Amino acid sequence: IKDQWGVMPYYDGDSVLELGYYLEQYLTPQGEFYSANGCFSDSQPGTNYIYSNNGAALIGYLVERLSNQPFNEYCNENIFEPLSMNNAAWLLSEIDDLNQIAMPYQLSGGNGNTCYEIGCGIYDQSNPCFCDSECVYYDDCCSDYDEVCGEDGSGSSGIQLSPLYHYGYSDYPSGQLRTTSNNLGKFVSAYINGGVYNGTRILEEETIELIKTVQYPNINSQQGLIWYYKNGNAQTLFGHNGGDLGSLTEMFISYLN
């Protein structure tokens, strides 16, 4: 399943489309968003690796079908509440005070030939700084980062930061969870401890081991289930990163220490 970005818009607020309806329109030939070439790779299963946000969304919808409840509600009852993640929400409608969450910013102005996002791993190949998802620090893949992009990543050719808006998108199980670093720490602790945090089990230990297992080593030697391995600080890390408009996140575990 490929991501066809032209039909995956950001909404001002939560998506107006329910997850199941969106996926039906995306994945079925009669769907509004369907494109055989745009939505699917022509590679045979098990022969190629493609990062897929809509693949993650489809897993979220599978949770809905198996549990007979919306994905966000399932997570509330089975992950967030058991782990006492009191400030965690997939949807903006679940947040009482939007002033409590960070406003994303976007870059505007410039001449089109400077860095257009802040962070490592989200630069276009046509721009002077291009980093891939494996880089750990800016200097790993862009030795002149500060010179080209400025110390804060805002560039030097009329680039300005301006507030965007609180947004959502239809494939939301692939991202858009809003929470605190302390809450994520509880979730990560459960992974480190075989699915248990503070005496509460959210996953079986066998499930954790399956997630950690590289699925197709001949294709991608770093990819487990959703999460992946990378080298950093002279050790192997396991986790995931993500980027959206005005946002870049990383969460990794070191099983060494």
Ranges and model annotations:
Residues 1-110, 151-245:
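Short, surface-exposed loop or secondary-structure junction motifs
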Residues 247-256:
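Short, surface-exposed beta-strand/loop micro-motifs that present aromatic residues
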